[in-house]
Amino acid sequence: MGGELVTGLGALRRRKRLLEQEKRVAGWALVLAGTGIGLMVLHAEMLWFLGCKWVLYLLLVKCLITLSTAFLLCLIVVFHAKEVQLFMTDNGLRDWRVALTRRQVAQILLELLVCGVHPVPLRSPHCALAGEATDAQPWPGFLGEGEALLSLAMLLRLYLVPRAVLLRSGVLLNASYRSIGALNQVRFRHWFVAKLYMNTHPGRLLLGLTLGLWLTTAWVLSVAERQAVNATGHLTDTLWLIPITFLTIGYGDVVPGTMWGKIVCLCTGVMGVCCTALLVAVVARKLEFNKAEKHVHNFMMDIHYAKEMKESAARLLQEAWMYYKHTRRKDSRAARRHQRKMLAAIHTFRQVRLKHRKLREQVNSMVDISKMHMILCDLQLGLSSSHRALEKRIDGLAGKLDALTELLGTALQQQQLPEPSQEAT
């Protein structure tokens, strides 16, 4: 990965080429990871429904899983090699050992470990009780505990999805994004792309995330519960239990019976709370007024509060006059009644004035930025026009000085020339 140093436009071309290669490698790695997970699901379901009748096909599926895993590990190494080359291009390095840090080596080894975990085709499937059920074990034979853990651990390969989405989003390949992000010190990583899609396509993102979590956790729960005593291992039951747990309702009609099933349900509840919070945030943002609607609403509320203030002030004057009138007539009962109405009118007037003041403060805080922008634009326009007028006046003054200099020079030359009579004498 070493070589001669490339600078300038060649470095930019090489960076773009490396990013394109990274995008293709990440895409193929995700395809191989998804293929391995699909083959793992196929192997588990074939073992459950078909048993030992299809042992040869089960062994063939496990061999295909191993083959896809080997290709996936090669692509992981190639991807990190491209990452090292990209780091060398950005920092002007020649030796790849300088670019390869201990943290990156640990990350590569961890990814190889995560992607290399799979059920190895070394022995025949565990189907001693396939197709038959006894009182001690009401379910047929299924995956062993170790093989089930290895199969479920293959779902950790889904960490490749954010990487592929980041490289496919075009953020890293867009020069405008990179330049503006560098000026504002913004790092374009996975969280930025997640926020970007949450702002542009919130409905699709939440729907895909929710359905993906439901289906994945439902299948994981069914695998964990299939050899339990209760009937929660059926996929139909888990497809009912997971959404109810995800939505934090929990009717209690279907419950997990194993420790792993309870852990899956607990994680599902936590994920449901997080997705519900995201959904509430998206819905709240969608229900907000836009700028034009907010201005119209505030304008109409301003008129409404001003009208209420006038009515409250008029009612206050009316009740004050009636209180004064009945006090002069010494009608204490009517005076007390109008005094109570006068105090109520004072309270109403104060409440309406407070609401009107809060509305004005809110409108001022909304208009501050746009108003400041307009003021700055007007100030810049005024300064530009004043500068141009000053330049014109300076140019005119310079022209007049040149003309005055020419006149003075001409006058001095005429004074220095002798008269003809003096030349004749």
Swiss-Prot record:
Pfam families: CaMBD (PF02888), Ion_trans_2 (PF07885), SK_channel (PF03530). InterPro entries: CaM-bd_dom, CaM-bd_dom_sf, K_chnl_Ca-activ_SK, K_chnl_dom. The chain crosses the membrane at residues 30-50, 59-79, 105-121, 141-161, 205-225, 263-283. The modification Phosphohistidine is found at H356. It is found in: Cell membrane; Cell projection, Ruffle membrane. GO terms for biological process: calcium ion transport; cell volume homeostasis; establishment of localization in cell; immune system process; macropinocytosis; phospholipid translocation; positive regulation of protein secretion; positive regulation of T cell receptor signaling pathway. The channel is inhibited by clotrimazole and charybdotoxin but is insensitive to apamin. It is a multi-pass membrane protein. Residues 239-259 dip into the membrane without crossing it. Keywords: Calmodulin-binding, Cell membrane, Cell projection, Immunity, Ion channel, Ion transport, Membrane, Phosphoprotein, Transmembrane, Transmembrane helix, Transport. Intermediate conductance calcium-activated potassium channel that mediates the voltage-independent transmembrane transfer of potassium across the cell membrane through a constitutive interaction with calmodulin which binds the intracellular calcium allowing its opening. The current is characterized by a voltage-independent activation, an intracellular calcium concentration increase-dependent activation and a single-channel conductance of about 25 picosiemens. Transmembrane helices S5 and S6 form the ion channel pore, which is surrounded bymembrane embedded helices S1 to S4. The S4-S5 linker, which contains two distinct helices, undergoes conformational changes upon calmodulin binding to open the channel pore. This is Intermediate conductance calcium-activated potassium channel protein 4. It comes from Mus musculus (Mouse).
